[in-house]
């Protein structure tokens, strides 16, 4: 039996606020455009030959009630003015016949750039170690990125990140970021 190997993927993100945590999460999913799907969280493999679609094109592939596989990150707070972030990063190998990595990260107090770079770094490190590339945990992300690019084996990294500041009146604030696997 051959399993489902997605050929396409898209990134999405959203934020929701409500007095109830669950409703805040639902509103974040609605903001991301994926609330009408039955979401199944999967681990962090970017399939071989998978193509990243623009969000609008990917959304056309979804139907209400559809079982939909996602790599998703979420963060929530009801602490006023607290910065939260949810991010998913991807590292794509040059050889499209092998798999890459997706990584999810959620945090408090990190900007969009810091959280997004961290998710990319996680994905790139997982791919680099799979490919047998040099890995030095003491190097900065910029130094590692340069090594990976020079190796000519990792073609690109990117992320989708949603940040928000906790509601000033203490409502639940939830952020989500997702890689949605379709096709």
List each model region and its residues:
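Helix-coil modules at protein/domain termini and other flexible surface or pore-lining loops
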Residues: 1-183
């Amino acid at each position: 039996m051959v399993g489902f190997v997605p050929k396409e993927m898209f990134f999405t993100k959203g934020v929701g606020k409500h007095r109830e945590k669950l409703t805040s999460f639902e509103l974040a999913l609605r903001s991301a455009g994926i609330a009408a799907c039955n979401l199944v969280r999967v681990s962090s493999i970017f399939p071989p030959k998978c193509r990243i679609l623009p969000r609008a094109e990917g959304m056309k592939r979804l139907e209400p009630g559809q079982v939909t596989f996602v790599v998703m990150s979420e963060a929530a707070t009801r602490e006023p003015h607290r910065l939260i972030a949810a991010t998913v990063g991807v590292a794509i190998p040059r050889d499209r016949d092998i798999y890459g990595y997706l990584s999810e990260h959620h945090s408090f107090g990190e900007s969009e750039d810091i959280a997004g770079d961290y998710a990319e770094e996680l994905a790139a490190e997982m791919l680099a170690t799979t490919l047998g590339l040099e890995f030095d945990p003491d190097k900065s992300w910029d130094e590692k990125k340069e090594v990976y690019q020079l190796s000519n084996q990792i073609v690109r990294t990117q992320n989708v990140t949603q940040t928000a500041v906790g509601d000033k009146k203490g409502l639940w604030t939830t952020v989500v970021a997702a890689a949605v696997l379709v096709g």
